[in-house]
Amino acid sequence: MGASVLPLGLGAGDCQSSSGRRMSACLPRTALSFLLSLLLATPGARAAGYETCPMVQPGMLNVHLVAHTHDDVGWLKTVDQYYWGIHNDLQQAGVQYILDSVISALLAEPTRRFVYVEMAFFSRWWHQQTNETQEVVRRLVRQGRLEFANGGWVMNDEAATHYGAIVDQMTLGLRFLEDTFGSDGRPRVAWHIDPFGHSREQASLFAQMGFDGVFFGRIDYQDKLVRKKRREMELVWRASASLKAPAADLFTGVLPNNYGPPEGLCWDVLCADPPVVDDPRSPEYNAKKLVSYFLQLATAQGRYYRTNHTVMTMGSDFQYENANTWFKNLDKLIQLVNMQQANGSRVHVLYSTPACYLWELNKANLTWPVKEDDFFPYADGPHMFWTGYFSSRPALKRYERLSYNFLQVCNQLEAQVGPAANVGPYGHGDSSPLNQAMAVLQHHDAVSGTSKQHVADDYARQLAAGWGPCEVLLSNALAKLSGSKETFLFCRDLNISICPFSQTSERFQVLVYNPLGRKVDRMVRLPVRKGLFLIKDPGNNTVPSTVVELTSSGNPELLFPALVPALGFSVYSVTRVSDQNPQTRSQHSRPQKYSSPVLSIKNEYLRASFHPDTGLLSMIEVLDRKLTLPVNQAFFWYNASVGDKRSSQASGAYIFRPSQQWPFPVSHLARTRLVKTALVQEVHQNFTAWCSQVVRLYSGQRHLELEWTVGPIPVGDKWGKEIISRFDTPLETGGVFFTDSNGREVLERRRDYRPSWKLNQTEPVAGNYYPVNSRIYITDGKMQLTVLTDRSQGGSSMSDGSLELMVHRRLLKDDGRGVGEALQEPGSGGWVRGRHLLLLDTAREAAAEHRLLAEKELLAPQLVLAPGQGPSYHHDHHEAVPRKQFSGLRRQLPPSVRLLTLARWGPDTLLLRLEHQFALGEDSSRNLSLPVTLDLQDLFSTFTITRLQETTLAANQLRASASRLKWTTEIDPISRPAVPRLDPSSITLQPMEIRTFVASVQWEENS
């Protein structure tokens, strides 16, 4: 997304060979050959890295000019429209031409340097180049003249993203660079110049990936003023409260001008600033004036930073389509400014890169301030809090989270089965399309919900296209593992209770795959026809079941409990039978309706009570722990501002700005229906025609499930609405609440407060909203109320004892941040269903519950249906009995360990990540916060690990040889622990530690 809306201009023209194929760097072949010869003759063709950085001038103010383009992987145009340069009526932007033009300009002058970031675009461009051009680019990279920063597939959002998906997309991009350029192309610096606020977990992940620092453009306007005054625009971010420093320490720099050029110095074809006119005979001569202005600008900017180095970003959104206009003027500026040194100037200007600038800061050997909180929420003005996008486009946010779940299942089965998953009886299975689509969705205008509508539709299209090849892969893998070639069917619409196969079949099988490293109990819910059903487990034992009718759709749903082994599957058979079957009658529970004045649902652990007059949730009791807490839950809506006397700022895709502090109730009461069976008890609440909820309690469950359905939000009254679910309790919380950071570590939040500066709160609601990726909770030190989410949402505690989460929003006015559309979400995006999981526990025992429950929700079991009675997979074993149950692990993982990644890496290698999912000191009831040691030998059942190499988090460097720059901080010096010797039989994980391995494997013949 752009820092500002710039005037449109004309881009560079295209050029093609006689065959119609694009020629290298848009240059005639003779010119390319000539420039290539110059490149080969250029001195200093050394390995890339800090040693290729340009010389600076000691004793002078060195101004590092960073030529760059910021290429959104979708925003106003789709990814393909941006790459090819289509629909320039929406935005002048063609990434293929930018890269062509930049390479040409770099070849023309050896001092020039350029930075590129988005591998989603660069990899596509790279594969379209000739061998000759590729060799030219490799040499530019080796010389440090073309530098990659960040290196992920995209520049991911930091508020609406889950850490697992962040790691995956960074791994995808960095692997492309490693495979293409080796260590020469390895980024040293993270470059998050456009995301709208910055999470602590993101910094921790960057540090664990081996980055030496991060630079970004956006921080809160109040924070920035304070930092400039204190000269704390650069600092060391201590990004984990669990990992021993400096493992998660990351040098952090705030750029002086967001990420655009200084005012008056934008020389792109999209800009209107005058070029450098250095001919004194011209009436347009301005060189002397520009030099004077630049010297004043550099000196003023330098006052806010601690060293004799400062940085200026020379570029912005989709700039450098005609790179010559930029570089020609920068060449002149550098020459003219440096000539003033003969007249006593102490300013030295040079082409540089983020890594080279960081290198000079490190060599300054200063003591740097330390930050331990995060950079949320972000505001660029008193009434301009970028907290709306935490909740924008909730349907897309859920689709992204479901796709992450499905991708992990796909990756795991591909890893467990090996090549037979890719080529088998169902065709060619491939995890790459979904992996790439998921990477694209992490972009800061994708999962954030801040693109135009047609772009959001295209993001969903990419995900849907990625599911298909994974479904083929799953079919191949499951056929091999089960020994039966079934007609596997995948119901993608189970979230809205639609599955034509289960709704029309009299007899079928349900294969339940569990991606967790531990066995799981799960209640299976499938839409069916009315009737009774006989369920058999893998051992042919009858399983209890019930059919519940949904009031929202009228479709009955079949429920039965499934027990599934770790990293494996169980196959259940379902048969529709007559009411006369005695076996069915004994195992089938009929729903019962109750007219008791006390409206409540209960199991062996919990009782939830509802107010008899309003139908709203009013009380939760934890029976075995004797905890009771009044909890009032209802839906409310904020009236979205369209601007007022204080500010013209409206609520929009990015900005949350309610017109008043207190929301309106959606309804003061709910019409209710009570359903009780042996397996589940439910209260169906209907608030309005567009807002309903089912409060559900399964047998054996320690949490309450609230399944809400909202939309389409009515706006006939011309009021935009932002819908929240709010939980009110009498807990005395002192303005404090807690939210997760990208689904991982938890941060304390305090109402109307920032740890880093004294806040002037100008928006009492929006200024207290924070991103919630997986959980939010309040506690009085004795009891803790936790709400888990099924997607990223905005959340807060607007009064003591209260929690709220924004579930949906529909707005009638654009917020002026460049999208140019109101967030209306026509069609299916306007109707959204989701779930909140409510946990009440003692503060001491709460972490053990919410950590493990969040893992189960993120990596939920995958249901695959089949008619049954398929032919044998093995041609030479016609009599073989199909396998009804399977586990990919010979022993379960401990509760504190999560299998973060199990995926194919190469023809005979796998990528394996194991993480400790508890924070330091978080759990004392079950000792789940202690270090844990694993034996990887003989752990997996379908393959044997023959060699194990440990890498950094993104798997692009061996851990033993990876090193990062060292920084001195204002906090006591830190000892740097040595890398432990790798012993596959003894892998120890410290709290919140992730360890990454590339494993050479040999698959078993009959896995």
From Swiss-Prot:
Signal peptide: 1-47
GO molecular function, a single term: metal ion binding
Class of the enzyme per the UniProt entry, highest EC level: hydrolase
Binding site for Zn(2+): 70, 72, 194, 444
Name of this protein: Lysosomal alpha-mannosidase
PANTHER family: ALPHA-MANNOSIDASE, LYSOSOMAL ALPHA-MANNOSIDASE
Keyword Ribonucleoprotein: no
Catalysed transformations (reactions): Hydrolysis of terminal, non-reducing alpha-D-mannose residues in alpha-D-mannosides
Keyword match Disulfide bond: yes
GO biological processes: mannose metabolic process
Glycosylation sites: 131, 308, 343, 365, 495, 540, 639, 686, 760, 927
Organism: Cavia porcellus (Guinea pig)
Superkingdom of origin organism: Eukaryota
Keyword terms, alphabetized: Disease variant, Disulfide bond, Glycoprotein, Glycosidase, Hydrolase, Lysosome, Metal-binding, Signal, Zinc
Localization, UniProt: Lysosome
Involvement in disorder: Defects in MAN2B1 are the cause of lysosomal alpha-mannosidosis (AM). AM is a lysosomal storage disease characterized by accumulation of unbranched oligosaccharide chains.
Gene transcribed to yield this protein: MAN2B1
Active site location: 194 (nucleophile)
Family per record: Belongs to the glycosyl hydrolase 38 family.
Cofactor(s) needed by this chain: Zn(2+)
Gene3D superfamilies registered for this protein in UniProt: 2.60.40.1360, Glycoside hydrolase 38, N terminal domain, Glycoside hydrolase family 38, central domain, Golgi alpha-mannosidase II, Golgi alpha-mannosidase II, domain 4
